Structures are given as structure tokens and as C-alpha cells.
């Protein structure tokens, strides 16, 4: 009478961990294999889908020729005083706003570019 898969599974489930380890070693020796997990070769994996960025940073790369206009826009966007906004513009490249939504970042970029600045979103 041949053993079924169910008989073998029941026998193994009643074994201790040490007995299972010994069984695996014996099977490796008998069949000349190792119990290392085989890597399945499936169909080519599609490129991983990049998570869409949810928080953006508006970086003033260059103030351009119209610094006064850029300072005004920086003040509107950040709520900074004149002196602080001028320091941001004079210190370009630098962060204007960070941790904001995509829509807010694009609106800030558009406003700064219309004022004459060069802007990057990160």
C-alpha cells in the first residue's frame, strides 16, 4: 500500500522540530539536493510603480532680473516680512516653501516664474 500525501503530511506534523531537521538532512543526502528556496523564474516583472509624491518643496533657483517682483511674491506665499523675504531671494538658491501639496507647489512655481524667477519643485 502506497503512502498518500496526506499520510506523509500527518506523519511530519507529529514530528518534533529536531526530527524534521534530521529528515530534511536525510532527504538532501539521499537525493543530492539542498533545501534552499528556489527562485521561481516567472514572467518578466513590470517596472515597479513609483509612488506619487504627495509633498513638495518649492526651491528658488535664481531670482532673475526682477528681484522686487520676486520678493513681493515670496512675501505673499510665505507671509514673511520684507526683510526676511529679501533674504530668501538674495540667498537663492533656497527653499521658499516645503511640505506642501502638488497644486499649491505648482501655483507657487507659476507665480514666482511670472515674477521672473527660476524655480524648481522637489
Swiss-Prot record:
- Pfam families referenced in this protein's UniProt entry, alphabetically: Ribosomal_L12, Ribosomal_L12_N
CDD domains noted in UniProt: Ribosomal_L7_L12
Claim: Ribonucleoprotein is one of the keywords in the record: yes
Q: Which Gene Ontology terms describe the biological processes this protein takes part in? A: translation
The domain of life for this entry's organism is: Bacteria
Q: Keywords of this protein's UniProt record, alphabetized?
A: Ribonucleoprotein, Ribosomal protein
Q: Which InterPro entries match?
A: Ribosomal_bL12, Ribosomal_bL12_C, Ribosomal_bL12_C/ClpS-like, Ribosomal_bL12_oligo, Ribosomal_bL12_oligo_N_sf
| GO molecular function per UniProt | mRNA binding; structural constituent of ribosome
An example GO CC term for this entry is: cytosolic large ribosomal subunit
The answer, when asked if Ribonucleoprotein is one of the entry's keywords, is yes
Write out the function statement from the record.
Answer: Forms part of the ribosomal stalk which helps the ribosome interact with GTP-bound translation factors. Is thus essential for accurate translation.
UniProt cross-references to PANTHER family, sorted A to Z: 39S RIBOSOMAL PROTEIN L12 (PTHR45987), LARGE RIBOSOMAL SUBUNIT PROTEIN BL12M (PTHR45987:SF4)
Q: Which family does it belong to?
A: Belongs to the bacterial ribosomal protein bL12 family.
Q: How does it assemble?
A: Homodimer. Part of the ribosomal stalk of the 50S ribosomal subunit. Forms a multimeric L10(L12)X complex, where L10 forms an elongated spine to which 2 to 4 L12 dimers bind in a sequential fashion. Binds GTP-bound translation factors.
The molecule here is called: Large ribosomal subunit protein bL12
Instruction: Give the lineage.
Output: Bacteria, Pseudomonadati, Pseudomonadota, Gammaproteobacteria, Pseudomonadales
Report which gene this protein is encoded by: rplL
